[in-house]
Amino acid sequence: MLFRSTGGATTSASAPTPAPGVAVAAPIPSLAAGLDAEDDEDTPAVLKVAETLTIVVEEEPSLEDAPTTVPSAALKEEAAAPEPAQSYSDSEMLDVVAQALENGRVDLYLRPTVTLPERRPRYFEALTRIRTRSDELITPSAYLSVAESSGMIPLIDNVQLVKSVQALRRLGPKSRIKGFFCNISVRTLLDPEFFPELVEFMEENSGLSESLIFEVNQPAILALETSELGSLDTLGALGYRFSLDHVSDLDVDFAGLRDRHFRFVKVDSKTFLHDMEVGGKGLPGADMKSYLDTFDLKLVVDQVDDEGTVAKLLDYGVELAQGNLFGAPKPVSPALLRELEEADAA
């Protein structure tokens, strides 16, 4: 099996069949349309989806119009975010997601990935939040299952990619921020309607290939057949790189990852430290950092929430980390981009 150092049976990760009674999202539109309005600040970019759903990707206001502070209500880490005040049935949540897509209420949030020991942001993980009509924030943990079963995940990925490209363009090539990790689902990579448009869009923005990193989770990748991995090769041929997230099985074929254009491996702190201190069946955590280095793979330790964990990570030479301790996700806004620019100039 690819990405695993030992053999075993695999199961296909083809797009799931929609759940009974759940509406299916319309075909995916052109991603390039999401940037059509970039030169006209008064016109939102509109992505048309067949005749039933229109996705709006609103252009961010200019830096001159930026507020001096970022709304504090939007600065909560997803893991610490409260459950929505209202309880939603699947059909109600489906309507919330569809309305958010139609009305430009799918927001991009950025969570810092910092260097150690300096704790300087060098990367950001791009995340999405959905706002209801009453501006209640809905995190992926609440809407993901419905979005997946209804086929709306590619639409949400669509918005995330367009907004990530917009933000990276604003930061510019001289920024010290090296890139964004953009979470993308395997369903999106396998979608026959969406993927050709994705390739075209990424080819048009190939100048950002060093800055935009596609992030996929290990369980989904392990479930792919070799024949389904062509999407990774296609994007890799354009110069784009990948990050493997949610790594819980350290029995990994790192050479295979490298050959498939993976350059980052993310492991949560508990998994990483447990293997260091107790010993796991796969690669011992104590050797993981140096071993990854031999394949030019960067280790990122996630879910770092306290100083004690940082001290242990430093003992093992970890150089990149993210978690509540270093900053919660913030909504992309002119204020945030200005903050990043000022950090660059410092």
Protein language model regions, located:
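Short, small-residue-biased leader/transition segments that mark boundaries at the very start
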Residues: M1-L2
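Low-complexity, Pro/Ser/Thr/Gly/Ala-rich intrinsically disordered linkers and tails that serve as
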Residues: T10-A33, A37-A45, T52, S62, ...
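EAL-family c-di-GMP phosphodiesterase catalytic domain
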Residues: T43, V186-T188, E215-A223, Y240-A346
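Flexible, glycine/charge-rich interdomain/linker segments that couple
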Residues: L53-Y88, I177-I184, P331-V332
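Active-site core of bacterial EAL-family cyclic-dinucleotide phosphodiesterase domains
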Residues: I55, K76-V146, G327-P331
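Short acidic-capped amphipathic helix/loop micro-motif used as an active-site/signal-coupling element
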Residues: T132-L137, L161-V165, H246, G323
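Catalytic core of bacterial c-di-GMP phosphodiesterases, primarily the EAL and HD-GYP domains
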Residues: M152-S227, Q303
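Charged helix-capping and loop-helix junction motifs
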Residues: P196-V199, S227-G230, G279-A286
